[in-house]
Amino acid sequence: MEKLDRYLQENFDVPAKNPSEEAQRRWRQAVGTIVKNRRRRFRWVPDLERRSLDKAKVRSTQEKIRVALYVQQAALIFSDGAKKKEYKLTGDIIKAGYAINPDELALITSKHDSKALKMHGGVDGISIKVRSSFDHGIYASELDTRQNIYGVNRYAEKPSRSFWMFVWDALQDMTLIILMVCALLSVAVGLATEGWPKGMYDGLGIILSIFLVVMVTAVSDYKQSLQFKELDNEKKKIFIHVTRDGRRQKISIYDLVVGDIVHLSIGDQVPADGLYIHGYSLLIDESSLSGESDPVYVSQDKPFILAGTKVQDGSAKMIVTAVGMRTEWGKLMSTLSEGGEDETPLQVKLNGVATIIGKIGLVFAILTFLVLLVRFLIDKGMTVGLLKWYSTDALTIVNYFATAVTIIVVAVPEGLPLAVTLSLAFAMKKLMNDKALVRHLSACETMGSAGTICTDKTGTLTTNHMVVDKIWISEVSKSVTSNTISGELNSVVSSSTLSLLLQGIFENTSAEVVKEKDGKQTVLGTPTERAILEFGLGLKGDHDAEYRACTKVKVEPFNSVKKKMAVLISLPNGTSRWFCKGASEIILQMCDMMVDGDGNAIPLSEAQRKNILDTINSFASDALRTLCLAYKEVDDDIDDNADSPTSGFTLIAIFGIKDPVRPGVKDAVKTCMSAGITVRMVTGDNINTAKAIAKECGILTEDGVAIEGPEFHSKSTEEMRDLILNIQVMARSLPLDKHTLVTNLRGMFDEVVSVTGDGTNDAPALHEADIGLAMGIAGTEVAKESADVIVLDDNFTTIINVARWGRAVYINIQKFVQFQLTVNIVALVINFVSACIIGSAPLTAVQLLWVNMIMDTLGALALATEPPNDEMMKRPPVRKGESFITKFMWRNIMGQSLYQLFVLGALMFGGERLLNIKGADSKSIINTLIFNSFVFCQVFNEINSREMQKINVFRGIISNWIFIAVIAATVAFQVVIIEFLGTFASTVPLNWQHWLLSVGLGSISLIVGVILKCIPVGSGETSATPNGYRPLANGPDDI
């Protein structure tokens, strides 16, 4: 992440939005004052000390690589007389037919050894020695042999943590360690006073409870670690284009081998070390490897390309010379540990809550222990005197201390920040199945609060399956149909005009025509390039003949800033010609001539220019993207390094490209509006095209504003403040305009903004936004690295699904906090009050440990994994600054706590009289009944917590098997504890009337919940709602 922050700062002047590590370190120290298990609380976030070491390693390696390159350049001057290391060919290499040692080949590229490369015959010689062809690549049948000799393209990874390491981490809990000591003391004293086996029951019960807590915790954490590992592997899946078996195909970087011919384009991350074959204007950013911020120009004179670097501009083909651990990038990556995730905002907030509650619990625990001890001493002093002590007295004090420590175990809600991780991990897994790869934990959480989505048009709102629908040429507009267009154009334009059109299409394109296994031709490239090239092929044009007839001298690839692509070609007659294709308004401004029907270049009059603009607007009003194609004859002595000219062009044609709106987008936009989320379309297209698509999607409303990027950029700060909230469409925009829009929405109005992007130049906006969403199909690797979420199917409806799950995460954690705080309050108060009044705690250490497991691990599993429902998208997003614990939650917490305290207090102080329980074991029966009723109150309150405002808490419960399984397991184990484990848990078996009473008292919590939800409270809104969002209704919702 540090490399990306530096890249954005140096190239786009965009500061990092994440907190510094020093701030994170101070925060952890602050919340670490009351921590049961610091290692577990901060498990899923980075080890800051290790991360610092990793950064030092990266800087050291970068410095070594940089110095090595300088030294190597100097050493070449003096290397003639030096004795060179000889690399021998092994029998396996010779048998396979290769003629170069793997280590020698790897060093040629990594050391930029031009002399060694020349000695081997240059790039051509290397390709012969590794049995590869620039045109046909390698044969797939050779993959195993090449991997055995030259290696696989994988880096050595540190082994995953075993299950027993998670068990060890769970045992680091300081309060569990203290309880273990208490249990051992209890066993020792018990054996001395009561003998075997009765004397060890109390201590053994605590030990078994600790074992159960540790094992459940370790299993939960281990499963989460496997899930994160799986998601991490998904993040590393990158696909690239190679030429194999004579055809271009897409493969995983892990399947790459030495000899492969790789196609590189803007935004790609170089997957392996290689040598440049040919290309156009290739600029490589090596800052991730060498630390140098200036891009490196790669050509046939300097053909070395290193793994881990990024293509900043241009395109090229390279031959792979080293993979995996034979690359410098592989060696660097293998030394680094897993980075971990920075704490999410919700984790930070809940860490603070857990610490505050922990301090309160510590005070209650100390007071409870002191009260119990003082009462014991008073009673002892009044009976036998303080001078006479027995071993049973020591056992009593040990049990008091164990109870106090257990109160801390229950009071410190260690499960709060961990529940966030569990809920996020569950959501990330589900989103992965729904075509959304969450790269950063915080993104899933933050997306639930998004109030604005700034989305691209092409491929996100539309299908990205483009076809040329209309064409204007020689002042004639034609609708395109595959069967008749060739004949229709021949009837209105001359063959020379048609030939010029086809030359412009075939030469000025980044798409390629490739042959599949069955011999059929397929066009590869961006959707726009494919559409135009397929149109040219539909005109019966001979792509291969045109490709062979002309030589490309210079290519300026399309990017979102220039909005055009230019190519300089050398014609067979010795002359040169520029072809330029791009945004209609930009290309038209560069033209002062046009091609007539006879193929002649004629001056472009103002009337003709106006008619052409009307044609462009007409195409755009039909929701067609428009592109112009033009050419310019140039002198033969032109400077190859000069940029393409910006004037003097002759207009050839205008293409109207159709890109239909994706099915379901209109409904998704409607869902956003009902959820209080504003959708703003930001596109580089013509404003009329953008408005037509926006209206079709339901984005542009009657009071919405559609504006062009240049006009938006020219606005003053005050004008922008008045305008920005009403902007729904921004056309002809640059990446900088998108970044400005995001910055102002966040800065001026405190909006939570999500942004989609696919190009390298979208990196600043993706990084600036609260949630960056990169396209998985059309997106470059640079865009993906800048993003928080990768939308694998490039579909807008998938983005809405991310928002839906984000809201589910936030609401689920609120449910869990409501449930846990209720348990905390009741457990603390009932034990403290009982200690003060009666002189004993009704809930023992073993019982409290079981309650803690219900509350922490099982409660988190049940409530933090609730799937989203449609109601979540009918309420406004949570605004920045709103309290996490709302008034609705406090109403439910206090109401349920008062009810439970009343019931348990009645049983404690009047249970024997009210229930007519008599006999020697009446006290044990009452305490067991209190414990059983307390647990069933939590079981039914867990059901209550499924809905914080709605009365119907059973909606969708059948479909949530995790919740049902947790409730069933809790009830089943409670029966086992009461009926069969009484010796260890200090309980006695209950009759059916007492069981019915316990379940009945617990179930009344459901009725209490209905009554509480009928009590109106304030909405709890703490911040302004600039978009006019409607606050949630008070009181109960519809059932």
From Swiss-Prot:
Activity regulation remarks: Activated by calmodulin.
Entry binding sites for Mg(2+): D758, D762
UniProtKB keywords: ATP-binding, Calcium, Calcium transport, Calmodulin-binding, Ion transport, Magnesium, Membrane, Metal-binding, Nucleotide-binding, Phosphoprotein, Translocase, Transmembrane, Transmembrane helix, Transport
Residues annotated as the enzyme's active site: D456
Pfam families for the chain: CaATP_NAI, Cation_ATPase, Cation_ATPase_C, Cation_ATPase_N, E1-E2_ATPase
InterPro entries, per database record: ATPase_P-typ_cation-transptr_C, ATPase_P-typ_cation-transptr_N, ATPase_P-typ_cyto_dom_N, ATPase_P-typ_P_site, ATPase_P-typ_TM_dom_sf, ATPase_P-typ_transduc_dom_A_sf, Ca_ATPase_N_dom, HAD-like_sf
Protein EC: 7.2.2.10
Family as reported in the entry's similarity comment: Belongs to the cation transport ATPase (P-type) (TC 3.A.3) family. Type IIB subfamily.
Name of the molecule in the record: Probable calcium-transporting ATPase 9, plasma membrane-type
Organism for this UniProt entry: Oryza sativa subsp. japonica
Species classification: Eukaryota, Viridiplantae, Streptophyta, Embryophyta, Tracheophyta
